[in-house]
A protein has these predicted regions:
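Active-site beta-loop-alpha junctions enriched in small/polar residues
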Residues: 1, 36-38, 65-69, 100-103
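N-terminal binding-site loop/beta-alpha segment at the start of enzyme catalytic domains
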Residues: 1-60
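Conserved short-loop catalytic and cofactor-binding motifs
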Residues: 6, 36, 67, 108-112
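Glycine/proline-rich, positively charged
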Residues: 10, 73-126
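Short, surface-exposed, polar/charged, turn-prone segments marking secondary-structure boundaries
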Residues: 19-24, 60-62, 89-92, 125-126
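Structural preference for beta-strand elements that scaffold enzyme active sites
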Residues: 31-32, 59-65, 94-99
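Secondary-structure boundary/capping motif
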Residues: 44, 71-74
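Short, charge-rich binding segments
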Residues: 50-55, 71, 88-91
């Protein structure tokens, strides 16, 4: 899928274009959609959620991620904010796959600080 940001418009999304692409994808049998809070300048989850919310929820799967880019998001509180925001932006009661973004970067020490010590792995496993 091409970048749905409108040319020369900052952070505006061509929602009509996103809707068209999602409708066409679903019609052709695509049922898995992967996104992240950081995609499309931070607007991907919202645009995808808007497009998919027009279809029955049992017809597709959503994958999104907990970001690993900004250390300011590593606390449990910030991680939970990111987690909850994904549900809101995606307009869904459940997310099929909650992935951990960029796990290998920084090695095990960074992984431990980002996902283990703040309890997010335990939370996601529940």
């Amino acid at each position: 899928m091409d970048d749905p940001n409108l040319q020369d418009s900052g952070n505006n999304i061509d929602q009509e274009g996103v809707n068209y692409l999602i409708d066409a994808a679903l019609e052709m049998g695509v049922n898995y959609f992967d996104t992240a809070p950081s995609y499309c300048r931070g607007f991907s989850e919202r645009a995808l959620g808007e497009a998919l919310s027009r279809h029955p929820r049992d017809k597709y799967y959503i994958a999104t991620k907990l970001s690993n880019f900004a250390r300011s998001t590593w606390s449990r509180e910030k991680s939970m904010e990111m987690y909850k925001a994904s549900y809101k932006e995606l307009k869904t009661d459940y997310i099929d796959y909650m992935l951990l973004h960029n796990v290998g970067q920084g090695g095990f020490d960074q992984f431990e600080k980002r996902y283990l010590k703040n309890g997010m792995i335990d939370f996601l496993a529940e």
